[in-house]
């Protein structure tokens, strides 16, 4: 999920190979200086949906930048029969379901998604990777994921209001940890950022290359080579990434499956020589924020705070923290 302008919530449907734009009608600006805390959100959601905590899966969270309400994508049940639900939580802790019955919406189809029967070498469905992340950047929706093209790793730049999605751009990167060029690994998380006053995508991949890609090159049918500006360590999956400014300097904050939460300087990202040889760690330096543990989801809350979903011994907690 990702928010666009005026309370529009973009939701990806990999199985259906579509992206929905939902008008949440949630445009009232929140007062500045607020925070958010909701402990045991998995238990509260399970009670709301009439099931047990082990029968729900929180897929994503997104903060409405206007109202500061938190939108939560949930699967009720496990496996192929799981039912998707979108919930909305406010600062008082109240959770309600976002009714989709009469909601104003538009959709765009992704024409060259992986076949529903396609599997990777581990036997996992490639169709479920049709959409791996979304970001609204410079008036366009950027959709990361896989396609059925030769360069399966795909980024689509889709104008909003929606026009046709097109086939997207095939992405090639050099993966330093693997020592080779790759075209089949999908972007796991991305964020928009201006480099030399030009809109770029910062994209992170499994095991953990960090790559810059100019948005202007994301034309349907094109093949684009990203610049790998950092290798942040293998055996890791990046989960979420935000950009923020603190004390006049820009930073990237990245949550990871097994390497904690990383803080990286965003200044002069174009000054790092692209990685083109096998390496373990190289490029943009980072520090690990030792106090942030068990982070599963991350989004920007406001200019001073981030929202995190953390696992505290089985209890999933939603809360804001001061940006480090």
Which residue stretches match the model-derived regions?
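Sequence/structural signature of beta-propeller domains
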Residues: 2-324
